[in-house]
């Protein structure tokens, strides 16, 4: 059984874009760009009992992070922004809200399309 949700994003701007949308307690962790296996394990070890989600950019860096997560945390669910927006931070909040809603996150009603 999971003890809460943990959402992993790339950077501070991604976190700031997503935080106001959520209507539940979610731990949001930042990789601060591309990281290695050791740093990833250090980041995620305290959250091993959480349900893991990733929300990385639709670019090469995001692809590398998704591949790293697949190898070491295959249970993590990957959320994806539309290639049109490319980055989480530039994706409109209402679009992010719909992606989060589909993944069973509770969101504030003002962001529902």
Label every PLM stretch briefly.
Residues 2, 20-113:
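TOPRIM fold recognition
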Residues 1-7:
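A short, flexible N-terminal coil/short beta segment enriched in small residues
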Residues 14-17:
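Short N-terminal binding/cap micro-motifs at the start of the first secondary-structure element
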Residues 11-12, 58:
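Helix N-cap/beta->alpha junction signal
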Residues 7-8, 54:
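Conserved SAM-binding loop
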